[in-house]
Each structure stands twice: as C-alpha cells, then as structure tokens.
C-alpha cells in the first residue's frame, strides 16, 4: 500500500514537470495522430464549457434536449454533500482504495439518489469555480502549488495481459496549460506515461491514472449481493469530499474514441452481463463524446478525506481480488481473440475502433458498450444495408430533443450488452443469478430520482453532432454485423444437426434462430443453458428500443420466439408441400384407358390367315416354297378343299361380320375395341427389278392357252375349263390380230396366273428404229411366242387385213377393253366393298400417297355400288407424279394417238360421247413407279386372298412388248422407263416454258461470257411451242424410247427454242410526259389594279381539260404558277404494216390558256387644268393661274373590252409534242420558253358605240406574255413499268435507286444452296448494288452471280426457324446457327453465314435487307434516268474544266 502511494506521489510530480513538453509534442502530432483532441482556451470558457465540465464529471450520456442554455440548468457533479468550495483547501487525509471506490459509487450517476442536484448551492459553487478560472486566465498568474500532502490511492497492481498498442486512437490524454515553472516537464511526463505500454505503466514507478482505475473498481460489484448493492446505491449518506483547484488554463475536449486497456475489455453485442454489472458499469462515462472519461482525465485532483470510510465496505477489496483473478484467467484463455480485438492495424484501417452503441440519459443504468470492428477476424462483414436494417429501429436519434424521448430514456431499465464470440467463457464465469423483483425495485427507485432533475446537455456544433451520428451509425452497423454472423453460424449448425427435432427442443437448446432481421438475436448457448431468464432478457435487448422496458421486452421476446417457431414450422411444411407438388407435377394426369396393344407377332390383322396387305415382298422369289405368300396360298387351297364354307374369302360364303371389319371401323373404336391390330410400320419398300431377270409369258405358250398350274390359284377367272377364260382368250387373240398397237395386256405374277387377271387397253409405243406402221398387226403365233429379254424382237406382219376400230374391238366380246374391267365378271360385289373399306383406312394413314395435279378421277364412294376398281379411280395417286404429268394432254390429242387412219370424224365424235357416258370402272394395278430406274414401290401383296399384280421390270429392253408392264393409268405418260438425265434447261418434257433463274452459275475463267447454266431447285415446265404442238397433231404418237442421236437432236431443238425471240411487246402507251408550268412573265396588260383582275390557267391535252383556281392577277405582270401536269403519250395511229420501229403517225398537242376576269370601272379619273384668278389691279388686267386636277368622269369606253375573248381568254400557248420534242426531254429535265399569243383582241371603234363588239375587226395575233415550262419524258420500255403521278416523286425514286447502287460490301461467307447441291462452301462475296457475286475462296474466280432483284425477303435465324416450323437438323444448327437466308420469288432459298463477329453478320444482314427493300425503286426508267443524269454531270464537269483551262 505504501509503495503504491509513494508511486502516485512521484508520478504527480513528474506530470507537473513534464507538462510543457507533453503540450509541445501533442501540438506537433495532434493534427495527425489525434484529430479529435483540441484545446479550448480559458478565455473562451463560458456556460457551454461549464456544461461540458458537468458532463465530464457526472458521467452522463443523455441525449440533447431542447432546453439549451437555460438558467435553470442544474449540474450533477456529485451528490449534494459535495462542497465545491473546498476545492482550494489542501487535504492531507489519506484514503484507502475502498473508501475512494465507495465515494465514487455514491457520487456516480448510478446512484439513484439524485435529488440533491436541485440544490442551488451546487450551482453557485460551479459558477464560482468558473469565475476563478476566468480570473486566473486574465491575470496570468501562476497558481500557487498546493502544499497539501499528495493524494494517496490504494491501487492493486496487476500484471499486464496484453501488448498495449502505442496508437493515438487508444489514448485518452488531456493537455492542460498551467503557469507552473515545471509545466513542460510535467506535461512531457504525462504524455510519455499515457503513451507507454501497459508493461511500463504497471511498473512500481509509473502507474497510469486513466479510466482503467475506474473500470477495475467497477469489477468489485460483480460479487455484491443485491441487498448490499441496493443499499450502497440508494444510500443518501454523503461523504465530505475535497478537491483541488484546476491546474489548467484550457480544458480540451476528450477524444471520441477512448483507449481500450486490458483492464477495460471491449464488450460486444452478444454478451449478456448481469444487471449489477450493467448498472454500475456506467461509472466510466461522463461525456457523449467520451463516455469513459473520469475525473483523472480532467487532472482535477480529488483529495477525498475520511479514509475511515473505507471500512464501511470491507468486502470490496476481497471481491476485487476474486474478480480480477477470474478475469486474468479467462482473458489468458481467450488471448488470441483479444489480440485481434486490440490489433492496431485493423483499428487504424477501419477508422474509429471503439464507438458507443448509444447515448443514454442521465439516470439510465445501462452500460456504454464498445464494439471493436476488428474483434474477431473471422467474423463475416455484412453490408451496410443489412446492418442498418437490423439495428436502426432499435435506437433513437442521437440529436433528439423532445421531452418524450427524454422521459423514455429515464424510464428505460433495459440492459443492452454485447459480447463477441471469443468472450463467451469470460461472460459465462459470472454466474450471478438475477432476481426480477429486485431489478424492478431498483428500476422504480432510480426512476424516481431521475424524474427529479434532468440532465444538462451542452450545445454542440452541427459538425460535432453530425460526426457523432455517423460514428454511432457505424457502430450500430458493426454491432449488427457481429450479431448477424453469430446468428448465421448458429442457424447453420441447428439446421444441420437438429433438423428433425421438435421446435420446443430447439428453443431449449438455444438452436432456434430467427430469420427476420427485426427479431432479437439469440443468446449464447452456455448462458441459455444456465438461465432461461437471462436468455429471454438478452434476446429482447437486441431488438428493443431505448424507450422499451425489460418486462415488455421479455414478453415480446417470447412472442417473437413463438412466432419464429411457427414460421419455421410453416416453412418446413411449405417446403414439404412444394416437394410433393413437384413430385406430383412430374406425373401425367390420369387419362382415359388406352387400348391395349398386343405384342408384335404374326397374327392376322383382318382375322384372315391369308391376308398379307401389309407385307412387301420381293416378287422374284414369290414362287419358292419358303416364301410366305406361297405358303399362305398353299394353306388357303388346303383349307378350301376341306371346307369351302369355313373360309371368309370363299366364293361359296356370304358376307359376314368378320369379312366386313375394316381398318376404318377399327380406328373409330380404337379406344375400346378388342381388335388385335398388328403394329407393323408399313413403308414404301422398294423392290429391285434387275434387267437380267427372264420373264415368262406362259399364257401364250400354245394354241390351247395352257395356263400355268398353280395349286393355290383356285379363284383364277382365266383358269382352264371355264367359258370366261376361253372368251377372254378369244378376245385377246382377236385384238392381237387386228390391233397390234392397241391390245389387252395381261396381268401376271412371275409367269404364273395371278388371282385375278384383268385386261385393259394399253398403247404400245413402237421403237423408233422399227417404224411399225399403224396398219400392221401381229400374228397369233407371234403373240403366243415366249419373248425373252434379249433373244427376239417384236416381229411385224404386212398382211393387208381390215383394221378394226376401237369400237369394234370393244364390241367383239363381253369385256370392255377401254376400261379393262374383267374382274366384275367373275367376282362378287362384296369384295369391292371390303376393298373400299381398306381404301378408307388409307385415307387416315399418315403415309398416304400424293395426289397428282392431273388426277381427273375422283373417289366414287357410292354406298349402293362399290367395286374393287374404285381403288384405281380414287384420288389416291399411287406414285409420285413426275414433272411430265404437270400439264395434262388434251383429250383430242390423246384420241388422235389411239385412233386409226380410217376413222372419220363422226366415228370419233360417237366414241367420245360413249366414253363420257360410260361408267369409269377401269382397273389399274398395285405397282408404283418412281423416276429411279429399275425400282418400283411395292404395296400390299394380297388383299383378302387376292393377289395384286406386279410387273416383272420397270425397264423394257429393246424387243420386249408392252405386255410385260402394266402402268398405273390407261394411257400413261409417253416416256416412263428410260429416264434420261434431265436438267433445268434440257428436259425431256413435251411441254416446256422458259423461266429465268434468280442466280446464274458463272463458268470459271470467263465471267463475262453468257454461257450460264440456269439453276433451279425444282423443275418448271416451259410453255408448249408451236412446233411441238404440230408434232402432237400428227398421226404417229410420240415415241416411248429414243436413240442417243434422236435425244441429242431433240435437245438441240429445245436449246434453240429456249433462245428469246424478238417479238415486240405491246405497250399501253409510249410513256409519261411531265409538264411543269413555272411562270408567265412580261404580261402586256395594264390597268390591273383598277379592274381588280383575276386569272386562271387552263390545261388541255386533247382528252382532258384541267383548270386551276382563280387567283388575283399581280400588278407587276409576272404570274408565278408552279403547276404540274401529267400527260400520258399515246399512239395516235399506225399503219397496218408498221413495225415496232416505224414512226408514229401523230402526237398530242398541249394547249395552255390564260383566262382573266375583271370589273369595269364605274368612273374614270381625268386630268383637267383649271384657270384660277389670282388678283386684279384697279386699272389692270386680271391675273390667272392654272391648276391641274383629277376628276372622276364616266368613261366613254374601256380598252379591256377589246382585249379578251368572250370566255375571258387573253393568251394561249400550244406545245406540239412530236418525236423531236420527246427526244430532247427524254429522261431529262429541260427548261423551255414559249410565247403566249393573243388572237382575240379587236381594233377599237373611233366612234364609241357605233358598232357592236363582234363587228369590230380583230387584230393580228401578237405576243402578250412569255411562258416558262419544265418538261421531262419517261419513255416506257416495259409493259409492267409504273410511273409516279407527280414529277416531284421522280427525284425521290432516283435518289433511292442511287442509294441502292452505292451499297457495297465484301467478305467471306458460307453458302448453302444455289449452285451448291448437298454441300456447303466458303466463298468470297462482293455485294454491289443489287448484284451479289461469289468467287472462289482462294483463286477468286467467279462462281456465281445472284440477282437480288428477284429476292423477296431476307430472313434472320429466328425467322428461318419460324418459317420452317422450327425443325432444323444438327448440321444447320452448328454451321448456320446465326445465319441469314435469301428467299427468291420462286421459292428458291440460299443460306449464308459469316465466320466473323456478330457486328459483321448484322452488317451483312442489314445491307442485304436494305437492298431488297429498295428493289421497289428498281425499274428500267429509273436506271435510264440515272444514266442520263450521270452523262449530264460528266458533260458539265468537262465543260467547266475546259473553261478553266481556257482562262
């Protein structure tokens, strides 16, 4: 004890000696290190300074009220027993630390008995002290040094725990100017002492007198019982205190951020301290800007007498020792975290390290808590918005001055305390249980004393207030960041470890974390387990405002936790429901039951073992026993032999429900039927027919027509031993003998008799080299002879026999050869009905056949009579129509191909009528032909047991007759078998027309040559020429096969026909002439003003007359008209023998007439000379003067009466439009001047009124005005040209055309389409105007020229997808993902893509789009007009250059 007292005495002396040095050091470093330390001279001390001193000594942190500097302000420096007048009295009493601490407790703001502050004695003493300070400042006298014995403090020395950072931010230094001789030395010692580390400060020779002393003393109350603490706080017993006079001239304001020493550990938001600690901890604050300042900071020596008062509370020293030991132990355990809290670098980087959480009222018992931004390095920094959103509602405005806020501050007993996560063990050691009744009682007592005297708040500058607000707001943000980090960590741990536990267990274990930022932060788990009451209080403290009481907060916290529990439960339930909904959404909603499909097996779809309608087979192997068709028919024959009635297809059975079942009916009842449909994918399988296959014609073998014996062909209508078979054979023989070119063709299957042999007429086209005449016919032996592929050719016979006409052949038997309906004679009608039902099923099939454009037959669905033949009469085209079918052949031409030479017109007309009236029952076949050679498309092999016939081959070599192939139509196209490779310009079609191509392929090496090949995506038929029409009218039909020479000759003919012929195209007119009447000048008409004349222009072109509105005639005689007229130039007449180059007989005349209207003047001004007498002498003459006057007189005659015609015409100009005139103004604007003639004026009569006006003679025509005209003629060069209605639009159109021609771009593009078929190529393109030219990528040889005038639109990538229905293959997606496409007027498309940036692609697209949009301005007259303008510009430039050279 004695050592400590001597140490304090020596320290005070050193402070006095080094004071001056300290002042100088602070002056040099104050602006850099301590920006908040400033000095206030004593001369400026007034009421504000005194109020600031009061604030320092009372440790109050109340908010500023609105009363300002009121004379009624009371200071609460200490209790009423404190005599400030004793400050000058030296005290020699020694006090124990316990007594000092007890005295501070009584004088602190925590003391609830503050009623003595109302004493006027305290205020008087304060004023006296201020006056003494002012007097010392004025006199500049050196104060007498106190001779009293030095102060003796009982301080317990502790070892330093941490390295004290030597930072000005952590110093709480006050520089005081004194008049002592050793002032410099004392200030220097004080400054050195304050800036030293705790190790030096705690040495025996130097102990700092800082706020650390009061903080250590505050720890003494941790072990006080509630009753004892209550007595010491509420006790009214006063202890006499003595002080000493202020040792300074100036009292600087304390820095905002106080130092944090090991004894004053910063406490964070999450720490829940006991109420006793909170109630007593505010002893350390005395100012809103430096809440932890104490008396020692002001250098006011408080020599408190009455050392024996230290015996009043002997427990204090022991408790202090116990508490400090606990503190030392706990801080050593948390050394790492505390080092982070006092890290100087973090503090300096982040600004003010310690800032108060809030400012409290005078009697508020809450502790001012500091939060270090760098306390925990692992704490996640939250955003300012989150921190403010969390903390801002919990605090009042720092500058609030309303009484309501003041009262709320006094009534508040909430304990706001925070703690960092690293200090949980430090807080947990203070296991002091609090009692709610004691706290309530203490709150009541303190509130009573607080209501008696309000705090005196000094007025501060606006800058200080703003700075305080900002610092506190930043402190709130840091505190909220720590709280947010703690809550997130706890929330993650609780969700991970206890997701399946109930909400009640989560609340007990402290793992239930609030989600909302507005909810209170949860307490640490150790404190939550220790006391539920502390958990409620600490949770409520985070969210309550300064005006809320603890009890209310406790209740609200419970409600918040309950609500939080409900929210968490609802969130879990909602997440669970969302998961269920997502799972349910993945399932397809229940639909009506679908039909149950059977497995793919070899069961029959039509409940018929012999039906193979969905099979496609190779007919070359149909006779082998291993084929299904042979096996099935063999089985059919066996079944029929046993029981014919049991077979549905038997000729003995009637139609049953089983046989009438069709695919259409099954499709209608697809959802509920029990029909076992075989889900086999039926496609158009192609059957290869090699030419080397030998075809046998067994039905022509011998005289008796022994047909091939087939065990399964029991239903053959031509089978042996039947009358029908022999009748058919006889008809065949007769037809073969009399009409070799028009004979029935027998349907067969690989040389064997088919299920139904149908005959119909087919024209055989003879080979060109055979030259078979129409009159020849084949003999019977020739007909029945086997014909091999390459063995023998069709012989000819020149026997002169009477030719039989088609009508005679048809009437020879019961068979109608022109329709070939032999099946109706041998089969029942029910088969046709079943087959019709099968055709209805094809109608619903997605793979239905294409309809031919020339298909004139329609599907006869007459329920009364349907036959099997309706298949071939239906609208179903069973093969893709080639290009030669696009133009039907006229019926008369077809008839000529079929008739003989001997038929007359009457017979032909009769046959034609009968053909029209006959029912169309002709039969085709089930064979499809494609343009591919030797390939046919196979359909059903059999339907209900009846075989469809197929041809052996699609290609007939030389020597084969036409019986080997049955074509689809009765009269098929002329050339079907030998498909000569065709090109767009060289086609074998008999009907051709020339269509220009949007682009041309340029031969390499010579782009200028016109040897382009027109490329077309789809072949188009050219119009029939006269030569080809004449050829069709000949008796000899077109040839089916041509030799190579003939083909070449035909191609040459077609090439010649393709060349354009010079045929004059009839134009509707010659063109359009635009006349613009600019003005009429030098008008010889006087007296316009007096006559009030008006004028109008009459424009007459011989067909129409146009008159302008009447306007006032200008007085100067110059009329500005600016009227424009459009004049179509027609052909007036032609000679009959005139050609396109002949001259026109006559042209139009344009007559322009000027008409006037005027008013006759009623009076005429006449000049007269009056003789006025001037004066008269007495004997002299009278003198006169002459004066001129104008008087109005009635005019005798008006000159204008003789100038105009009766209709008002005054001047006329006739413009003759002849060839020379049109040539001069063609595609050029020319300025012309014409004289306007007056031929209506008459010679005035000398004697007015002697003759009538029409009796007067006329004057000779004479010029009365000049007409200025601009003319331009646009000559028509095409019948489709369109001319604008006004000449003003011509210039606009020309400007648009020039804009199009000036568009230029070049670069590399990927091309797909056009001349590139099936491949993509990178080329170099040049865009110039409406021409897009493509060149080779490397050699730059011309490859393609694209005429953009035929492009209708340019599509982007998204437009291409929409136009194509959104279907794109993978190659297009990769190479042409961001492409553009040119669409031509004929449907041709060319796709381009640029391997460059998006800007380059957009540039290509924009330029092409602009060119296409400007195509509407691209007409022949526009082009010629631009060329004419270019020539004029060139001529004008040349003339100007020559003129300059000449000069």
Swiss-Prot record:
The modification Phosphoserine is found at residues 10, 78, 81, 91, 96, 167, 367, 511, 616, 805, 811. InterPro entries: Bud4, PH-like_dom_sf, PH_domain. SMART domains: PH. It comes from the Eukaryota. The modification Phosphothreonine is found at residue 365. Induction: Cell cycle-dependent with low levels at START and a peak in mitosis (at protein level). Residues 768-879 are annotated as: Interaction with IQG1. Residues 22-32, 59-76, 277-316, 497-509, 538-548, 649-664 have a biased composition (Polar residues). Its main location: other. It is found in: Bud neck. GO terms for biological process: axial cellular bud site selection; protein localization to bud neck. Residues 1-37, 57-76, 272-316, 444-588, 649-672 are annotated as: Disordered. Residues 1302-1413 form the PH domain. Phosphorylated by CDC28. GO terms for molecular function: GTP binding. The keyword Cell division applies. Residues 1-16, 475-494, 549-580 have a biased composition (Basic and acidic residues). Keywords: Cell cycle, Cell division, Phosphoprotein. CDD domains: PH_Bud4. Required for establishment of the axial budding pattern in haploid cells. Cooperates with other bud site selection proteins to recognize a spatial landmark during mitosis and they subsequently become a landmark for downstream polarity establishment factors that coordinate axial budding and cytokinesis. Involved in the septin organization at the bud neck. PANTHER family: BUD SITE SELECTION PROTEIN 4. Interacts with AXL1, IQG1 and SEC3. This is Bud site selection protein 4.
């Amino acid at each position: 004890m004695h050592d400590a007292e001597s140490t304090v005495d020596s320290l005070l002396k050193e402070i006095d000696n080094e004071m001056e040095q300290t002042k100088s050091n602070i002056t040099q470093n104050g602006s850099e290190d301590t920006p908040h330390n400033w000095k206030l001279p004593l001369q400026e001390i007034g009421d504000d300074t005194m109020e600031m001193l009061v604030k320092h000594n009372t440790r109050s942190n109340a908010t500023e009220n609105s009363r300002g500097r009121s004379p009624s302000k009371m200071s609460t420096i200490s209790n009423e027993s404190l005599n400030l007048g004793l400050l000058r009295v030296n005290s020699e009493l020694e006090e124990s630390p316990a007594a000092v601490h007890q005295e501070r407790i009584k004088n602190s703001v925590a003391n609830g008995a503050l009623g003595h502050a109302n004493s006027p004695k305290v205020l008087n003493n304060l004023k006296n002290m201020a006056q003494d300070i002012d007097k010392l400042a004025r006199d500049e006298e050196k104060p007498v040094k106190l001779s009293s014995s030095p102060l003796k403090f009982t301080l317990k020395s502790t070892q330093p725990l941490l390295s004290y950072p030597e930072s000005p931010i952590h110093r709480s230094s006050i520089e005081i100017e004194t008049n002592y001789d050793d002032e410099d030395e004392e200030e220097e010692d004080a400054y050195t002492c304050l800036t030293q580390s705790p190790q030096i400060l705690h040495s025996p020779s130097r102990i700092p007198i800082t706020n650390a002393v009061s903080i250590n003393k505050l720890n003494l109350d941790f072990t006080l019982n509630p009753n004892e603490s209550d007595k010491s706080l509420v006790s009214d017993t006063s202890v006499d205190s003595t002080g000493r006079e202020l040792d300074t001239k100036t009292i600087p304001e304390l820095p905002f951020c106080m130092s944090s020493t090991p004894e004053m550990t910063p406490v964070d938001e999450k720490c829940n301290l006991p109420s006793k600690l909170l109630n007593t901890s505010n002893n350390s604050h005395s100012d809103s800007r430096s809440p932890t300042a104490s008396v020692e900071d002001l250098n006011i020596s408080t020599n408190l007498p009455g050392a024996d008062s230290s015996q009043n509370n002997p427990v204090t020293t022991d408790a202090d020792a116990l508490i400090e030991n606990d503190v030392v132990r706990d801080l050593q355990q948390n050394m790492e975290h505390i080092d982070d809290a006092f890290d100087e670098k973090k503090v300096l980087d982040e600004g003010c390290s310690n800032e108060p959480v809030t400012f409290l009222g005078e009697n508020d018992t809450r502790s001012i808590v500091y939060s270090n931004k760098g306390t925990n390095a692992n704490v996640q920094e939250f955003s300012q918005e989150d921190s403010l959103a969390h903390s801002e509602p919990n605090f009042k405005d720092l500058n609030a001055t309303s009484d309501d806020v003041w009262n709320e501050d006094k009534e508040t007993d909430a304990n706001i305390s925070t703690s960092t996560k690293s200090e949980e063990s430090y807080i947990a050691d203070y296991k002091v249980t609090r009692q709610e009744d004691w706290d309530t009682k203490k709150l009541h007592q303190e509130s009573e004393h607080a209501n008696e005297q309000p705090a005196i708040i000094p007025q501060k500058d606006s800058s200080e207030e703003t700075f305080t607000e900002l610092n506190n707001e930043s402190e709130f943000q840091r505190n909220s960041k720590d709280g947010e980090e703690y809550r997130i960590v706890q929330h993650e741990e609780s969700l991970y470890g206890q997701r399946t536990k109930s909400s009640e267990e989560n609340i007990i274990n402290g793992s239930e974390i609030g989600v909302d930022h507005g909810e209170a932060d949860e307490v640490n788990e150790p404190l939550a387990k220790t006391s539920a009451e502390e958990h409620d209080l600490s949770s409520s403290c985070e969210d309550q405002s300064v005006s809320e009481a603890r009890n209310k907060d406790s209740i609200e916290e419970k409600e918040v936790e309950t609500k939080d529990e409900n929210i968490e439960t609802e969130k879990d339930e909602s997440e669970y429901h969302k998961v269920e909904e997502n799972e349910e959404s993945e399932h397809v909603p229940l639909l009506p039951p679908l039909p149950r499909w059977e497995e793919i097996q070899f069961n029959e779809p039509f409940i018929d073992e012999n039906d193979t309608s969905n099979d496609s087979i190779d007919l070359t192997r149909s006779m082998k026993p291993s084929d299904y068709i042979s096996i099935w028919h063999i089985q059919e024959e066996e079944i029929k032999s046993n029981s014919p009635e049991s077979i549905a297809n038997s000729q003995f059975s009637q139609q049953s429900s089983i046989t009438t079942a069709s695919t259409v009916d099954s499709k209608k009842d697809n959802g509920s039927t029990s029909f076992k449909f075989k889900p086999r994918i039926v496609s158009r399988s192609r059957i290869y027919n090699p030419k080397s296959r030998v075809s046998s014609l067994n039905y022509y073998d011998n005289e008796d027509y022994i047909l091939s014996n087939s065990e399964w062909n029991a239903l053959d209508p031509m089978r042996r031993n039947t009358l029908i078979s022999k009748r058919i054979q006889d008809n065949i023989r007769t037809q073969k003998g009399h009409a070799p070119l028009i004979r029935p063709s027998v349907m067969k299957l690989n040389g064997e008799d088919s299920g139904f042999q149908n005959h119909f007429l087919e024209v055989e086209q003879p080979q060109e080299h055979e030259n078979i005449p129409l009159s020849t016919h084949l003999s019977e032996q020739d007909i029945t002879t086997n014909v091999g592929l390459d063995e023998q050719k069709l012989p000819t016979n020149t026997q002169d026999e009477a030719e039989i006409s088609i009508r005679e052949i048809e009437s020879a038997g019961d068979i109608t050869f022109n329709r070939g309906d032999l099946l109706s004679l041998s089969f029942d009608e029910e088969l046709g009905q079943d087959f019709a039902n099968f055709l209805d099923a094809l109608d619903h099939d997605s793979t239905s056949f294409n309809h031919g454009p020339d298909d004139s037959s329609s599907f006869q669905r007459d329920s009364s009579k349907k036959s099997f033949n309706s298949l071939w009469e239906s609208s179903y085209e069973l093969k893709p129509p080639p290009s030669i079918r696009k133009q039907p052949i006229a019926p008369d031409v077809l008839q000529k191909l079929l008739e003989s030479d001997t038929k007359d017109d009457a017979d032909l007309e009769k046959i034609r009528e009968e053909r029209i009236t006959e029912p169309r029952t002709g039969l085709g076949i089930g064979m499809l032909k494609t343009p591919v050679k030797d390939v046919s498309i196979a359909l059903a092999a059999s339907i209900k047991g009846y075989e469809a016939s197929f041809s052996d081959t699609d290609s007939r070599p030389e020597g084969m007759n036409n019986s080997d192939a049955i074509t689809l139509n009765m009269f098929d196209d002329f050339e079907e078998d030998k498909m000569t490779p065709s090109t767009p310009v060289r086609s074998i079609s008999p009907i051709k027309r020339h269509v220009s191509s949007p682009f041309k392929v340029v031969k390499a090496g010579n782009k200028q040559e016109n040897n382009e090949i027109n490329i077309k995506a789809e072949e188009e038929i050219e119009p029939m020429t006269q030569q080809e029409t004449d050829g069709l009218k000949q008796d000899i039909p077109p040839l089916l096969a041509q030799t190579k020479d003939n083909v070449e000759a035909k191609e040459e003919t077609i090439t010649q026909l393709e060349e354009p012929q010079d045929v004059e195209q009839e134009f509707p007119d010659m063109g359009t002439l635009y006349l613009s009447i600019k003005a009429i000048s030098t008008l010889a008409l006087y007296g316009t003003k007096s006559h009030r004349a008006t004028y109008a222009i009459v424009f007459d072109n011989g067909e129409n007359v146009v008159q302008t509105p009447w306007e006032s005639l200008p007085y100067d005689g110059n009329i500005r008209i600016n009227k424009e007229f459009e004049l179509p130039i027609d052909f007036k007449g032609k000679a009959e023998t005139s050609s396109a180059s002949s001259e026109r007989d006559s042209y139009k005349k344009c007559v322009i007439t000027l008409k006037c209207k005027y008013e006759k003047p009623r009076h005429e001004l006449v000049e007269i000379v009056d003789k006025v007498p001037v004066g008269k002498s007495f004997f002299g003459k009278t003198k006169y003067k002459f004066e001129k006057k104008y008087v109005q007189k009635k005019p005798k005659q008006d000159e204008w009466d003789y100038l105009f015609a009766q209709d008002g015409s005054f001047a006329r100009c006739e413009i003759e439009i002849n060839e020379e005139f049109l040539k001069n103004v063609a595609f050029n604007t020319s300025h012309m001047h014409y004289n306007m003639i007056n031929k209506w004026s008459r010679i005035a009569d000398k004697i007015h009124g002697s003759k009538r006006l029409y009796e007067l003679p006329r004057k000779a025509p004479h010029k009365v005005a000049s007409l200025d005209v601009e003319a331009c003629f646009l000559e028509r060069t095409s019948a489709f040209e369109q001319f604008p209605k006004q000449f003003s639009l011509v210039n606009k159109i020309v400007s648009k055309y020039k804009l199009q021609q000036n568009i230029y771009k070049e670069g590399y593009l990927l091309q797909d389409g056009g001349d590139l078929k099936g491949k993509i190529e990178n080329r170099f393109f040049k865009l110039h105007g409406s021409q897009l030219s493509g060149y080779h990528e490397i050699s730059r040889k011309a490859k393609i020229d694209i005429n953009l005038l035929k492009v209708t639109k340019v599509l982007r990538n998204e437009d291409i997808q929409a136009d194509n229905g959104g279907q794109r293959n993978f190659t297009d997606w990769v190479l042409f993902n961001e492409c553009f496409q040119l669409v031509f007027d004929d449907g041709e498309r060319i796709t381009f893509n640029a391997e460059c940036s998006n800007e380059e692609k957009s540039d290509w697209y924009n330029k092409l789009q602009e060119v296409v949009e400007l195509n509407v301005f691209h007409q022949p007259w526009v082009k010629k007009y631009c060329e004419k303008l270019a020539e004029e510009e060139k001529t004008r430039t040349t003339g100007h250059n020559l003129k300059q050279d000449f000069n």
